[in-house]
Amino acid sequence: MKRDLSRRNFLRAGAMVGAAMSTPAMLSAAAPATPTTGKPSPIKLGLASYTFRNFSRAQMIGCMKQLDVLGLNAKDVKDHLPTDPAQEKQAIADYTAADIKLHAAGAIYFPKDEDDDIRAKFEYCKRAGVSVIVAGDPTPASLPRVEKFVKEYDIRIAIHNHGPEDKLWRSPLDILKLVKNMDPRIGCCIDVGHTARTGTDVVEAIHEVGPRLFNMHMKDLADLSVKESQVAVGDGKMPVRAIFEALITNKYEGFVDLEYEIHADDPMPGLTSSFAYMRGVLASMGYVIPALSR
């Protein structure tokens, strides 16, 4: 136990150093120096734009540059990824100019079991060039219609679980039960916080979902049963290293997107600490951390 605590303190120290720095090069240097395998990290760290729901697109882009993170799960919040085609085109141009990769959109909601409504969502994502739709609420009854558009557009659907309060999709295992016999491009976005709050083992869920895991929302909780206990990653009880190990074992190719929902008006200290901690964990596993997390 003492050895584990010492290691945890060591990694947290790396996160604290990162929190005190402001340039991308210095942020990358905050990861603990350990012997490496010489292999680049197979874990791609990204950001869920909901984190910056109180900030404009330009402000978010500036913050992402400071964080050394260029992978984005964008949501139609503020002006991050507007649904209006002309405004969306400008947003895409801004991200491209900043070398930010839009890899997913959402959470996107599907309140209507109607072709026109569902097609509009897929067209929106097609214009953005994303390969994954993080879906908040498709009903079991609407899934066959959604599946039709998945096949037409070749865009994957990752249903996002929302914990004990969600009547349909409490945990990834609830999602898996209903999609396991559908098109393989229909799967899960595992929100680790919401998953833990249902009493589901996050690591076991990753293994169970397997190839139907298309996106990850990372966060940490001081109490794994309490939604309001969110803290910076590394300051809570989330088994971050075990999560990364499970993803690597399963050859997960998607992004691990930090969704930092607290301190909406001042998220940067917690984000800086969280990314430094996660990079420190990966470095402690022997991986080379790339200069930019794409």
Which residues does each predicted region cover?
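Short, mixed-charge, low-aromatic patches
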Residues: 45-50, 74-78, 99-103, 129-136, ...
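Histidine-acidic metal/acid-base catalytic patches
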Residues: 2-44, 54-68, 124, 169-172, ...
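Conserved anion-binding
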Residues: 158-167, 174-176
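Hydrophobic faces of well-ordered beta-strands that scaffold small-molecule active sites
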Residues: 43-48, 72-74, 102-107, 133-135, ...
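Structural motif corresponding to the early beta-alpha repeats
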Residues: 70-156, 166, 194
